[in-house]
Amino acid sequence: MFTLLITGTDTDAGKTVLTTALAAYWRTYFPSQSVALLKPLQSGVGDRELYRELFALNQPPEEINPLYFQAPLAPPLAAELEQRSIDLSLPWQTLVKLRQSYDRVLVEGVGGLGSPITWELTVADLARDWGLATLLVVPVKLGAIGQAVANVALARQAGVNLKGIVLNCVQPRSETEIAQWAPADLITNLTQIPVLGVLPYLGDRTNLAQLAAAAAQLDLEAFLSA
């Protein structure tokens, strides 16, 4: 059984793209291995609906996303608007159940690694407390190097088991832009965390074949054997 948390440097770093790409990859190339998707907390409409549309999951909505809040805000603020508390035991119990039933469980975090999930805890704290191997998505843009270094420092401070970095083209990028804005060798040298590759810009993020092909270009073998 394999469990992986996908987090990012920020809200729009590309967590959902990487999560769906990995799910498409394993379902395409390893069809005998079952894959479950989990979004422990969600604020606003988004990932759980996309997951069900893309993969025709047998998982009920409350299993994909145990804690849902209507307002597209940080979870503690969204929960406050609804006069609700955030009980992390519910998504934890869901994760335990999924681990018992599926070969692979992909967990998508909310916001960025430093984003709050309660008034006291961040995504980094959740990754540590749940003992999750973690991938960090860094968008390819000016400032990507500094974002990567800062988030890896946060991961180390929090005790996160950070396994790798994936660079993601949130907009069409040339090879020159990628090399100058998010040089993999420099990021690896500064963080001592391997960069597993670059996800290209995907205009159609519902094309399973394209998603699987994009994930296939990542150095997943090195990551899985680490």
Curated annotation (Swiss-Prot):
InterPro entries named among the record's database cross-references: DTB_synth_BioD (IPR004472), P-loop_NTPase (IPR027417)
A molecular function GO annotation: dethiobiotin synthase activity
Pathway: Cofactor biosynthesis; biotin biosynthesis; biotin from 7,8-diaminononanoate: step 1/2
Residues noted as binding substrate in the record, renumbered to the chain: 43
Record keywords, A-Z: ATP-binding, Biotin biosynthesis, Cytoplasm, Ligase, Magnesium, Metal-binding, Nucleotide-binding
Subcellular location: Cytoplasm
Protein name stated in the entry: ATP-dependent dethiobiotin synthetase BioD
Gene (UniProt): bioD
